[in-house]
Amino acid sequence: MKESIYYNEENEIQISQGNCFPEELGHNPWRQPQSTARVIYLKVKDPIDTTQLLEITEIENPNYVLQAIQLAAAFQDALVPTETEFGEAIRFSMPKGLEVAKTIQPKGAVVAYTDQTLSQSNNQVSVMIDRVISVLKTVMGVALSGSIITQLTAAITDTFTNLNTQKDSAWVFWGKETSHQTNYTYNVMFAIQNETTGRVMMCVPIGFEIRVFTDKRTVLFLTTKDYANYSVNIQTLRFAQPLIDSRALSINDLSEALRSSKYLY
């Protein structure tokens, strides 16, 4: 039986068993279980607690759920203000992420990282999506089981499409715009523990700085078949940490972990 842990509208962690999440979460395909692993999606409504990374977590052994939450909290400190044209937007910074990684306890290691900019002119949105996925596959390496590839593809597709349904989400920041250019940042984090990762937890925070050379309304309703001109900066790293068993903690401790620093380091 597949289980999914999520927050309801009252900001409480809940568990859903079966092949899909509650209807209000179902419009995002990566939030649906894709394998026999437990896929945990965590989101809070309270502005004080809301993370600014869209967290996509696959954990085969629930004893390591808390570790995934801790890593997500740690890499929040690697979100930094963007360039001037992005206004008040913030994004995951790979250099800052390298600094944060050195402070995390128990110690882990950064095993891959990249800072790349991809551009395209008058080509389909799907072409840019495929190029971004190719870059991230290289960084994520052995962590890519079949279900993770499915979730990665869905997450990156929604980085460039379906933006009208996400425009007010915590992980999307809209920068300055003109009638000819729209700037936004998008932050995602994968935490993965499965048979391919072995005795470590893989954490992959990703930050995008995206320039689309058209107006915002067009950007909000882009589909994979539409044509668009892009400049996309990708900053990401893959952090590996030895597994930390949290089986002694109850499900209530998951909520506490998001609110109390005593669990973070």
Curated annotation (Swiss-Prot):
GO cellular component: extracellular region
Record GO terms (molecular function): toxin activity
Biological process per Gene Ontology, one example term: sporulation resulting in formation of a cellular spore
SUPFAM superfamilies: CytB endotoxin-like (SSF55676)
Keyword Membrane: no
Top-level taxon of the source organism: Bacteria
Keywords: Sporulation, Toxin, Virulence
InterPro entries: CytB_endotoxin-like_sf, Endotoxin_CytB
Modified how: Active after proteolytic processing.
Protein's UniProt keywords contain rRNA-binding: no
Job description of the protein: Kills the larvae of dipteran insects by making pores in the epithelial cell membrane of the insect midgut.
Family: Belongs to the cyt1/cyt2 endotoxin family.
Name the UniProt record assigns to this protein: Type-1Ba cytolytic delta-endotoxin
Organism of provenance: Bacillus thuringiensis subsp. neoleoensis
Encoding gene (name): cyt1Ba1
